[in-house]
Amino acid sequence: MFKSKFLSFVSLTLLPVALAQSEYTNLPATAPGVFNATARIEIKSTVPAAWDVLTDFANYAAWNPFVRYALTTSAKGNITLPDQRPVEGNFLFFRVQIPALPLPVNKDTPDNLLNTQLSAERITHVQPELGRLAWDYLGELAITSTRWQALSDIGNGMVLYESIEVFHGLFAGVLKDTLGESLQQSFEAQAEGLKLYLEC
């Protein structure tokens, strides 16, 4: 009996370490696309704290070198909402930097106008119980994409942040050739910015 309890204790103690070192993911399975941009980073924080920062769109400029401005509007009537948190079905409008600005950033860090782009998205999944958030790009049929972000408690006071955006469509190959490397850099910079902000 003592031996089995000891082994159970050792297994539970080592499980978070194994998760952190493995290719564990909290991201859902996604269909392959023409290309994708991804990020994965361990952060000394809690899932609730990271979720609060990730879903506080009004405060993105305080830490995010990629998404410098985010605005949510209602699905009906396209009305700016007083609560700038994600709700499934609502719209998101972003002003982004591709490539991302150098870290660190804050709300007063100016954009590089040559790298500024705008995008419109629809929020598709808000899953706080799973630590997952997703939206679809509302572009032309020539380029479509879905972006997922996920948070996981991996033990020892650490959170795993993951993000993936999968691009499809006729012009997705052109996007990959022109901005693929910069998009990847931007995803990695956002992950680093989240880490810096949560660990300061």
Model-derived regions: residue spans:
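Hydrophobic pocket/interface hotspot
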Residues: 49-54, 60, 94, 123, ...
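Hydrophobic/aromatic beta-strand elements that line small-molecule binding cavities or substrate pockets
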Residues: 39-41, 118-125, 137, 145-153
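Fungal secretory targeting signals
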Residues: 1-20
